[in-house]
Curated annotation (Swiss-Prot):
Belongs to the frog skin active peptide (FSAP) family. Dermaseptin subfamily. It comes from Phyllomedusa tarsius. GO terms for biological process: defense response to bacterium; killing of cells of another organism. Its main location: secreted. This is Dermaseptin-8.
Length: 32
């Protein structure tokens, strides 16, 4: 279903966003 597909995409984007945020935080800490 479209709703299930959109939910899957949203979950994937949230997962990727968390990973990117974690990496960005590490870069900021390393830069200090």
């Amino acid at each position: 279903s479209l709703r299930g597909f959109l939910k899957g995409v949203g979950t994937a984007l949230a997962g990727v966003g968390k990973v990117v945020a974690d990496q960005f935080d590490k870069l900021l800490q390393a830069g200090q």
